[in-house]
Every structure is written in structure tokens, then in C-alpha cells.
């Protein structure tokens, strides 16, 4: 797929962060929240070509706002760079240039105008589903930033696990 850049592969980084936050037995400890389950259900339900909207929301979000979240978490939680591997894109030295490359690949996808509109709608819905996860995590935990970081890891791991 034209937007399946190797630089975006996150599973090893995700596993490293999960081990940092939950320990070696993390696979038996964490489970998806209701909002995460709804997100995964949506991803499984839609036509594969509309996953582009989720891909765009996830990765451009991680390369933009995710970098801000990473820096805030690192400073406010004194993480010294640990537990943040998910937000490290070692193969992307210049996120701005990469995002331009990604957008060019999107612009060149062989899709119809109407599919493009549906992909945009799905990207907006993916953003809403992400916000549902944040709302659920924030309302149930005393440390919102840590809960958000951990919740993103749970969401992502839940989505990866559901594809296997």
C-alpha cells in the first residue's frame, strides 16, 4: 500500500512502552476499555479502503500532537525518555518532511472523488473515536496524562491484537 511506510511500524516500540508501564506480564494485565472496543469494532466493520482515514488520523496525529504529548509527559512525569518509545520515530528525522511525503502519497492514491470524501468522513470519525477513548480514560483515572499515555497504548495494542 502506498501509505504503509516502514517508518511508521510501531509494534516493537509499543511493546517496549507496555513493558515499562505494566511490567513483563503486561499482555495478561491490560485489556481494552469499552471505547477501545468500539474503536476496534469500527475498524473491523468498515471497507478496507476507508482504513486510510484511521491511518491518517493515527500517524499524522502521532507525528504532530503526539510529539507535544510526549514532551509534556516526559517533563511532567520525569520519565527521562522512558515509556515514550511509541512516539519516537527513529526512521523519521524530519517529521515535517515526512508528513509532506505522506500527504503526497495520499494525494496519489487511486481512489474516486466520492471515496475520497468517505475517507475524509472516516478520518473525522476516527478522531471522534480517539476522543471517546481520551474521555473514558480521563474520567476514570486520577492522573490524566499518565492515563492518556497508557490508554493510547491500550488502544493501539487492542487494534493490533484484533488484526491477528
Model features per residue range: what roles?
Residues 1-164:
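Metal- and O2-centered redox machinery and metal/ROS homeostasis
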Amino acid at each position: 500500500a502506498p501509505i504503509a511506510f516502514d517508518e511508521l511500524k510501531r509494534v516493537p516500540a509499543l511493546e517496549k512502552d507496555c513493558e515499562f508501564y505494566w511490567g513483563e506480564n503486561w499482555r495478561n494485565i491490560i485489556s481494552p476499555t469499552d471505547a477501545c472496543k468500539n474503536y476496534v469494532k469500527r475498524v473491523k466493520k468498515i471497507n478496507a479502503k476507508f482504513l486510510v482515514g484511521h491511518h491518517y488520523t493515527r500517524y499524522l496525529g502521532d507525528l504532530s500532537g503526539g510529539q507535544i504529548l510526549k514532551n509534556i509527559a516526559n517533563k511532567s512525569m520525569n520519565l527521562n525518555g522512558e515509556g515514550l518509545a511509541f512516539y519516537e520515530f527513529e526512521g523519521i528525522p524530519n517529521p515535517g518532511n515526512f508528513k509532506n511525503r505522506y500527504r503526497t502519497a495520499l494525494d496519489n492514491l487511486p481512489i474516486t472523488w466520492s471515496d475520497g470524501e468517505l475517507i475524509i468522513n472516516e478520518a473525522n470519525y476516527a478522531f471522534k473515536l480517539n476522543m471517546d477513548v481520551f474521555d473514558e480514560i480521563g474520567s476514570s483515572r486520577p492522573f490524566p496524562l499518565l492515563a492518556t499515555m497508557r490508554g493510547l497504548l491500550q488502544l493501539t495494542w487492542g487494534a493490533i491484537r484484533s488484526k491477528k
